[in-house]
C-alpha cells in the first residue's frame, strides 16, 4: 500500500492523498484526497492516522461515516489534546454523545438534532435517567463542537452545525469558601495530621491541587519566602506525569506568608527525619515537597480522597480541597487587591476568568466602596 503524500495548497492548507476504502477485484484501492488546514506536522499526523485506519480495515467513506465512528477515530489518539483532556473527552463521547447521536451520518447531522440532544441530556442524560447539570451538558457540547470543527478543517463536512446551537446557560453559583472562624477550626483540628502542612500551604498560596502535588524543593526559596510554579502533576488512567502550566499565566512566582514559611521549615525537618528512616538521604532539589510517606509522588486524586476522609472523621466543613484555593482568593479580594493582582497570583489565564468565578465577591467590595464614598460626602453638622 502507498505511503500517501502531502501537497501544499495554501499558506495553511494541505492536500492529503492516499489509497483507501475496500479494494476492487484486482486488489486496488480507490485513491482518496483530503484537504487539511493546519501546520505541515499536523497534516503528517492526520495522514498517518488515515493510513492506520486503512491498514486496520476501519477506514470509511466520508459519506458513510457515522458520528460514533468519527469521534472514536478522532479520540483514538489526538496529539493536540493533553492525556487528561483526551480521557475526559472520550468519557463524554461514550456516555453523552454516542448513545444519542452516534448512529447519525456525520454529514447529515443538523442543528435541530443537536438542539434536541441537549434537551434530552438536561432532562435525563445522567445515570438512571437523572438530569444532567447545564455545566456537564455544556462540556459534552464542547466535545461535539470541537470534533465538528476538526471535520470541517478536513472538509468532511461543509459546516459545523453545533455553532448554531448555544450551550445551555449555567446559573452562576457562589463558590465554597471557608470563613475566618472555619479556617481556624480546620487548622486546629488538623494539627498533627499529615495533611496539616499541605492545607496550610494551600490556604496560604491558593495553588491548585496538581501544582501542590508537583512542587519540588528546588522551586521553593524559604529565605526569600517565594515559590515558583513551573509544573503540575496530572493523573490519568496511564499513571502520573508532570506537565507545564496550561497557560503562560500559570507559570508564576507566589510569595509566602510568614506562617506558611514556618510550617514549611518544620515540614522539611520532619521529612528529612522520615527520609533518613527510609535510607533515602537528604532531599534534593528534584524531590517533592509533599510526597507520600514512602517519598513517592502524591496522586492528586488521592489527596482529594484523603481530604474527604479527614473532613468526615474530624467533622470539618464539608467543602472540597479546591475550596481552599477559593478561600485564598476570597481573602485577597477582602483585603482590597484588584482583579489583575488576584488573577496573577492564583494563575488564571486572564482577569476575566477571575471575575467570572468571583464576581459576587468583587461586587460586595464595590458596594462597600460606594457606602464609604457616600459617608465621606455626607454633609457635616
Regions found by a protein language model. Name each.
Residues 46, 61-152, 161-166, 182, ...:
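Short, Lys/Arg-enriched alpha-helical recognition elements, typified by the DNA-recognition helix
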Residues 130-134, 138-142, 153-215, 222-223, ...:
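Basic, Lys/Arg- and aromatic-enriched nucleic-acid-binding interface segment
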Residues 2, 188, 224, 233-260, ...:
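C-terminal secondary-structure termini that scaffold catalytic or DNA-interacting sites
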Residues 37-54:
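A short, charged, amphipathic alpha-helix used as a generic interaction element across diverse proteins
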Residues 126-130, 185-196, 205, 254, ...:
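Short, basic (Lys/Arg/His-rich) helix/loop patches that form interaction surfaces
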Residues 162-164, 224-229, 320, 331, ...:
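Short functional hotspots where side chains directly engage DNA or cofactors
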Residues 1-35, 84, 224-226, 231:
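Short, Arg/Lys-rich segments that mark the N-terminal edge of DNA/RNA- and chromatin-recognition modules
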Amino acid at each position: 500500500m502507498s505511503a500517501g503524500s502531502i501537497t501544499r495548497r495554501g499558506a495553511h492548507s494541505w492536500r492529503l492523498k492516499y489509497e483507501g476504502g475496500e479494494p476492487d477485484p484486482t486488489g486496488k484501492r480507490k485513491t482518496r484526497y483530503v484537504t487539511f488546514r493546519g501546520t505541515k506536522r499536523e497534516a503528517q499526523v492526520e495522514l498517518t492516522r488515515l493510513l492506520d485506519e486503512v491498514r486496520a480495515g476501519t477506514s470509511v467513506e466520508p459519506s458513510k461515516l457515522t458520528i460514533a465512528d468519527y469521534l472514536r477515530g478522532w479520540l483514538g489518539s489526538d496529539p493536540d489534546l493533553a492525556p487528561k483532556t483526551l480521557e475526559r473527552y472520550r468519557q463524554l463521547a461514550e456516555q453523552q454523545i454516542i448513545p444519542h447521536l452516534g448512529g447519525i451520518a456525520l454529514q447529515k447531522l443538523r442543528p435541530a438534532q443537536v438542539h434536541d440532544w441537549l434537551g434530552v441530556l438536561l432532562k435525563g442524560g445522567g445515570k438512571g435517567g437523572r438530569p444532567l447539570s447545564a455545566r456537564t451538558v455544556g462540556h459534552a457540547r464542547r466535545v461535539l463542537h470541537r470534533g465538528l470543527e476538526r471535520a470541517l478543517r478536513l472538509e468532511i463536512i461543509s459546516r459545523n452545525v453545533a455553532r448554531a446551537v448555544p450551550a445551555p446557560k449555567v446559573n452562576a453559583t457562589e463558590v465554597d469558601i471557608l470563613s475566618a472562624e472555619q479556617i481556624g477550626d480546620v487548622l486546629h483540628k488538623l494539627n498533627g495530621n499529615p495533611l496539616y502542612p499541605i492545607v496550610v500551604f494551600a490556604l496560604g498560596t491558593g495553588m491548585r491541587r496538581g501544582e501542590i502535588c508537583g512542587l519540588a524543593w528546588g522551586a521553593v526559596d524559604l529565605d526569600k519566602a517565594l515559590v515558583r510554579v513551573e509544573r503540575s502533576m496530572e493523573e490519568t488512567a496511564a499513571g502520573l506525569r508532570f506537565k507545564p502550566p496550561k497557560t503562560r499565566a500559570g507559570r508564576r512566582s507566589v510569595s509566602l506568608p510568614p506562617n506558611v514559611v514556618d510550617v514549611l521549615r518544620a515540614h522539611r525537618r520532619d521529612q528529612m527525619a522520615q527520609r533518613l528512616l527510609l535510607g533515602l538521604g537528604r532531599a534534593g532539589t528534584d524531590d517533592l515537597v509533599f510526597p507520600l510517606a514512602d517519598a513517592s509522588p502524591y496522586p492528586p486524586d488521592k489527596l482529594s480522597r484523603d481530604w474527604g476522609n479527614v473532613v468526615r472523621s474530624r467533622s470539618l466543613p464539608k467543602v472540597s480541597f479546591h475550596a481552599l484555593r477559593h478561600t485564598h482568593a476570597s481573602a485577597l479580594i477582602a483585603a482590597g487587591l484588584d482583579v489583575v493582582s488576584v488573577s496573577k497570583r492564583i494563575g488564571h489565564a486572564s482577569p476575566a476568568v477571575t471575575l467570572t468565578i468571583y464576581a459576587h465577591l468583587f461586587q460586595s467590595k464595590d458596594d462597600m466602596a460606594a457606602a464609604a464614598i457616600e459617608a465621606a460626602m455626607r454633609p457635616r453638622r
